[in-house]
Every structure is written in C-alpha cells, then in structure tokens.
C-alpha cells in the first residue's frame, strides 16, 4: 500500500481510493495492523470484516464489525461436521452436525465438499458463540 502512495504521489490512500469502505481480511490476526491501516485512510469510516477461508474452501465470514464471531456459510458446497476435541484420535469418535453443537465447546472441523473431500479433518478448531445464526 505504501508503494501505491509512492507511485501516485498521494499522502494517504483515501486520496487514491476516496470511496473505499470495506476491508476483508483473514488468515492472520489483523489487530496488530489495524492502526497502520487506519492511518492510511484518515477520516474515513472503514468497515473491517474477518473471513475464514482455506485451500479447502471458504467457510465463514464476520457479518457485523462489532461482533467477534463469524457466521458459517452453510450453502457454499461444504458440509460441516464438528468433532469434540476429546474425541480426536478415537476410532469411534462422535461427530456432530450443525444441529447438535453446543455453545463454548471446542470442536475440530470436519468437512466434505463438492471438490471431493470426504470427512476431511482440516486441523482447525472452533467454538460456537451463537446457535442461531451459526
């Protein structure tokens, strides 16, 4: 982004992108970078939204800036199952569907997708902060 300032001769990115309103981020904790990013857009009310995506699919997005949790994308060619962490490694592990999850319980994410993944344990864990919407 600093290269854009250098090339354009602008002092802020707001001069280059005056209608910039939304920044989607994901994969890393954005908080250490928020202040630097906001300094590039002074006096603009930028909305920041987190997303949960991976090579295996796009799983969730933050719908409201003031809420920490994200909402699962349940109509995106991915079927979600949730394995309680105490079940990991068990040959008869109990796996839950979206209707069977509990709040504040840690789950390992298991996905099946139209891309050919079947009951794939991707290595991520999550907790539900809301049961509706998920």
What are these regions (language model features)?
Residues 1-134:
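Active-site glycine/GP-rich loop and adjacent strand/helix microenvironment
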């Amino acid at each position: 982004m600093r290269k854009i300032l250098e090339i354009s001769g602008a002092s802020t990115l707001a001069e280059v992108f005056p209608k910039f309103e939304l920044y989607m981020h994901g994969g890393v904790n954005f908080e250490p970078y928020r202040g630097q990013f906001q300094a590039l857009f002074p006096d603009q009310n930028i909305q920041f939204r987190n997303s949960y995506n991976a090579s295996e699919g796009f799983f969730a997005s933050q719908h409201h800036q003031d809420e920490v949790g994200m909402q699962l994308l349940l109509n995106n060619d991915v079927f979600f199952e949730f394995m309680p962490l105490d079940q990991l490694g068990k040959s008869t592990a109990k796996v839950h569907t979206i209707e069977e999850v509990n709040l504040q319980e840690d789950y390992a994410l298991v996905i099946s997708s139209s891309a050919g993944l079947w009951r794939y344990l991707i290595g991520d864990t999550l907790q539900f902060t809301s049961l509706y919407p998920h």
